[in-house]
């Protein structure tokens, strides 16, 4: 049984599933922005869908706040996603993920395709977001062990869908599992 926020998701109605979505924020691997909508409109989208109680002015104010929180300069808000850099698209995706003040944030390979400087920037945004939003659970899916250890206070390592080890990062450094040790040697100790 998989429970989210105390509810068994296998028995949820369609209506309950839709209501549950407002508790989640997802930063997708490739940002998954609407190409035909401005950066600002991409962030406003989940608010329009799930917060019918908000006025247009309130939605706009929240979107501006989340974009600012994500570190995106206001001069880019009226641009289309294709007109901004990969790092800016990630920031826009993060702002959209944060728009509903979710209880659970999921980051799917958030630094894929980014250079080391942008990778560190995105990692820092994730850390800042997690540290400033008390009561929010964050799940970061990554092949970058160094980042996982830097960001996560609890890490799980999977191989072919099976959990090899889970716990605090320090546990991985002390593991005698040969596969875990190999990953750690390649991904963390070399850094």
Task: Describe each model-derived feature in a short phrase.
Residues 101:
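Conserved catalytic motifs of ABC-family nucleotide-binding domains
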Residues 80-84, 88:
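Conserved ABC ATPase signature
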Residues 120-134:
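Helical segment within the ABC ATPase nucleotide-binding domain
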Residues 8, 56-75:
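Conserved ABC ATPase "signature" region
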Residues 105-108:
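Catalytic Walker B motif of ABC-type/P-loop ATPase nucleotide-binding domains
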Residues 166-167:
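ABC ATPase "signature
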